Amino acid sequence: MKHLHSITELSNDEIMHTIERAIMIKNGEIKRYENIYTANLFFENSTRTKCSFEMAERKLGLQVIPFETSTSSVTKGESLYDTCKTLESIGCDVLVIRHPENNYYEQLHELNIPVVNGGDGSGQHPTQCLLDLMTIYEEYGKFEGLKIIICGDILNSRVARSNYHALTSLGAQVKFVAPEIWQDHSLDAEYVSIDDAIEEVDVCMLLRVQHERHDEDAANFSRVNYNRMYGLTRERYDRLKEEAIILHPAPVNRDVEIDSELVEAPKSRIFKQMENGVYTRMSILSQVIENNR
């Protein structure tokens, strides 16, 4: 792994290597790096991904260059490429970027330093996908044959897209649950009712309703109706298999995608995902650093 733009760039072996390395790091096998400089360029708001990357970088001994888009020359019209080329020129070794434009990284092929994608529009979120995979693998020790539903705003979700590609490649059976207006038929997955699927799934992955990516739909959105038709309610939770787990990339709209009381219920792994995000990103960054030396 010399960079990470999309989960589709990785073979199954590379995915498994990244997960296994993350588990080793979690168990205390941490290699620290000297004189490696990184910058995190987040052009969309973020709590988990941005802080998780910074924690991963600091645990690896990396020097993190502060960068805030609101006080940078981006506000003066500087292009993404020129911003990144500037950071390369002053000595950054790795860039982590989140950007609202799908496939923004295609503008950056002339850079001589690696880019790790922290999320591009509704395109890809490879590091979130890999931490989700790590969390599933810790529970089941496999992907082959697992039954997984991904519930919510599929059309606007980079998390759904990345997870669908990786999980199906690894042998899991993935189905979607979504209102018709938020379905994405470019992904060759079956759409089902949550009530028809809930009793047989091994993993119930919930997605945030992304109000900021909607227009006229937002005015017609009903939290109560969404929760009733598509959300994980207590009644649905009680129908899950004993060993089933719940995932959510967060932030969580409580009482919309999931009843508030279930966010930290025994089957929930939502905060475990956040913990694993640090180890997964340490695994990714260490591979990128070592493969670009």
From Swiss-Prot:
Specify the pathway: Pyrimidine metabolism; UMP biosynthesis via de novo pathway; (S)-dihydroorotate from bicarbonate: step 2/3
Entry's Gene Ontology cellular component terms: cytosol
Q: Where is the signal peptide?
A: none
Please tell me where carbamoyl phosphate binds in this chain: R48, T49, R98, H125, Q128, A250, P251
Q: Does the keyword rRNA processing apply?
A: no
Q: Per UniProt, where does L-aspartate bind?
A: K76, R158, R208
The EC code for this enzyme is 2.1.3.2
Catalytic activity reads: carbamoyl phosphate + L-aspartate = N-carbamoyl-L-aspartate + phosphate + H(+)
Q: Which GO terms describe its biological process?
A: 'de novo' pyrimidine nucleobase biosynthetic process; 'de novo' UMP biosynthetic process; amino acid metabolic process
Give UniProt keywords alphabetically. Pyrimidine biosynthesis, Transferase
**Keyword Transferase carried by entry:** yes
Domain of life of the source? Bacteria
Q: What GO MF terms are annotated?
A: amino acid binding; aspartate carbamoyltransferase activity
Q: What class of enzyme is it?
A: transferase
Q: Which family does it belong to?
A: Belongs to the aspartate/ornithine carbamoyltransferase superfamily. ATCase family.
Q: How does it assemble?
A: Heterododecamer (2C3:3R2) of six catalytic PyrB chains organized as two trimers (C3), and six regulatory PyrI chains organized as three dimers (R2).
* Free-text function comment from the UniProt entry: Catalyzes the condensation of carbamoyl phosphate and aspartate to form carbamoyl aspartate and inorganic phosphate, the committed step in the de novo pyrimidine nucleotide biosynthesis pathway.
Would you tell me the protein name for this molecule?
A: Aspartate carbamoyltransferase catalytic subunit
Q: Which organism is it from?
A: Macrococcus caseolyticus (strain JCSC5402) (Macrococcoides caseolyticum)
Gene of origin?
pyrB
